[in-house]
């Protein structure tokens, strides 16, 4: 996208950065449309969409990457687009919409390699559990999506491998003869998760590592600033969804939505927590769409959950700021006070205007 923009408008900052901002805006818009499809109530749906879109747009990792020349903006747009296609596929058990899911994820793979496929388990599970058709039909539908994914994500790899090495343009690491498969499966693939090789030394001084473990993403200051301060609120949202499901208060598409976003969030959180290769804190941008969607869904379905999520997010932000010793101590107390005030105002508003 950036290359096309530069060809059209010349090499300048606007040509490089405007496409990233446009893709960020598009990702927010597609997430809003997805939430409208999940929450079909004419009042709750737009509110859930606005909350989800606002969380995505205001998450620091997203705010950074949507104005930076990096593939993450396009990756997030394609992942959210795949979620929209899945939400369209489930109600009618449509293999055509599911094929579009595969195409979008294949393009996400080309954009950021294996990171673009972290949502694959969430999508497959949601369709398997909630598509209103027989198990015998669900398997062929998923197979069609898998074929579409392989074709859309593998055509460029195949072209590079089949192109004569002597005239092959640069692909990765700046060398014309670099094997594309090694890049996708090694340096930019499994090595990022399990370590190995010498990935950290390949011109990425910004790479950041710490001890792998589930607590890394919660207690790491770097990841905390970017997105993980939303995780306590997202956990409250997941618990809310489970309670609503057990009480049979969710429609089929709402249950599918909670499942999709929850598995998306859990898988990405575990991957980022246990990665032993090179890790950049901005990778947590992949958490933002799922966290925003879960928070939006829970907020419109449970008043108490909305209040608890506000307090949980603010409390964890204060903890992270205190651990990182960022800013004066008065800032921490100001955030805590603002969160308490917001929670009280929300509780009063919900009491006075029950339709909220």
Regions found by a protein language model. Give the residues of each.
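Transmembrane helical bundles and short interhelical boundary loops of multi-pass, membrane-embedded
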Residues: 303-356
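Short hydrophobic alpha-helices at membrane interfaces in multi-pass membrane enzymes
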Residues: 91-106, 307-310
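Transmembrane-lumen/periplasm boundary regions of multi-pass, lipid-linked membrane glycan transferases
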Residues: 119-244, 317-327
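Membrane-interface transmembrane helices that cradle and orient dolichyl/undecaprenyl
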Residues: 38-39, 43, 82-97, 299-302
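Short helix- or helix-capping micro-motifs
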Residues: 49-57, 105, 109
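Transmembrane-helix motifs of polytopic, lipid-linked glycan transferases
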Residues: 18-42
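Short acidic/glycine- and proline-prone juxtamembrane loop motifs at membrane-interface regions
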Residues: 61, 67-74, 111-113
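Specific aromatic-rich, kink-prone transmembrane helix
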Residues: 30, 75-92, 104-105, 124, ...
């Amino acid at each position: 996208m950036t290359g096309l923009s530069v060809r059209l408008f010349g090499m300048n900052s606007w040509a490089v950065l405007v496409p990233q901002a446009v893709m960020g805006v598009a990702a927010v818009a597609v997430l809003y449309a997805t939430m409208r499809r999940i929450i079909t109530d004419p009042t709750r749906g737009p509110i859930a969409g606005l909350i989800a879109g606002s969380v995505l747009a205001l998450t620091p990792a997203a705010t950074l990457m949507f104005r930076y020349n990096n593939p993450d903006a396009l990756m997030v747009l394609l992942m959210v687009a795949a979620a929209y296609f899945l939400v369209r596929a489930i109600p009618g058990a449509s293999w055509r919409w599911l094929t579009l899911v595969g195409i979008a994820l294949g393009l996400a793979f080309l954009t950021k390699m294996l990171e673009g496929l972290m949502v694959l388990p969430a999508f497959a599970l949601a369709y398997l559990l909630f598509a209103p058709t027989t198990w015998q039909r669900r398997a062929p539908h998923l197979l069609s999506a898998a074929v579409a994914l392989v074709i859309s994500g593998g055509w460029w790899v195949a072209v590079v491998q089949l192109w004569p090495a002597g005239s092959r343009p640069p692909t990765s690491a700046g060398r014309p003869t670099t094997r594309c498969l090694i890049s996708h499966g090694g340096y930019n693939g499994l090595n990022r998760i399990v370590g190995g090789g010498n990935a950290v030394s390949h011109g990425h001084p910004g790479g950041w590592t710490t001890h792998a473990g589930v607590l890394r993403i919660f207690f790491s200051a770097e990841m905390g600033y970017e997105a993980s301060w939303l995780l306590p609120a997202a956990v409250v949202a997941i618990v809310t969804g489970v309670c609503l499901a057990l009480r049979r208060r969710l429609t089929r598409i709402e249950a599918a939505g909670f499942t999709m976003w929850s598995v998306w969030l859990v898988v990405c959180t575990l991957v980022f927590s246990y990665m032993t290769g090179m890790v950049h804190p901005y990778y947590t941008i992949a958490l933002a769409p799922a966290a925003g969607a879960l928070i939006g869904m829970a907020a419109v379905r449970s008043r108490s959950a909305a209040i608890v999520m506000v307090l949980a997010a603010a409390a964890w932000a204060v903890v992270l700021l205190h651990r990182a010793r960022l800013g004066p101590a008065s800032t921490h107390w100001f955030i805590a006070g603002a969160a308490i005030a917001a929670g009280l105002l929300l509780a009063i508003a919900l009491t006075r205007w029950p339709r909220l």
